[in-house]
């Protein structure tokens, strides 16, 4: 079975941390995901300090000629989720480096036609079935999307209307894949950061615990903003 939860938090908190530490909003998101997973590992009595985890991040792919408008066309790359770093500020800096390295690797892979989507296009169906069988045998030790799938998508800044009806919130989710038990997807919309969590309920029976951990990680970074922004709440409201 699956557990699914979603809720909103102020996007200004992400902007304040981004501005205060000189990183991107996506870096803040990745760092908070890493801190959340660290808390979960500790709850499950694993050694969270042992090593980093691996996150799978989907990206929009370049459609071949004639494929315009035909469903989704995406690829994926991987980044380190530094759950092994206890200090939130150090983890944020490491997440910034991890995200930058992933972007460079993805660009080179796409240019060489060697990204995951391109490779799967040339794999025969029987080989993909064998890969899935092998991944399932590993019981979470290996997965197409690493240890967790995560996605941060910038959404509309202005309200969207369907006829005269205003869209109040924007929630979206990805999938959980073979070998990966949790997906954390965040959309921004009209000043809100909308976080959706989909998980294998055998591994994570309470999705709200994951959401609460994420909020705590974000609030911790806000509280640790540099001294030039003495009042975290003032820094958030001024952004």
What positions do the PLM features span?
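Flexible, Gly/Pro-enriched loop and linker segments at secondary-structure and domain junctions
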Residues: 1-7, 143-185
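A generic structural motif
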Residues: 13, 21-22, 63-65, 80-86, ...
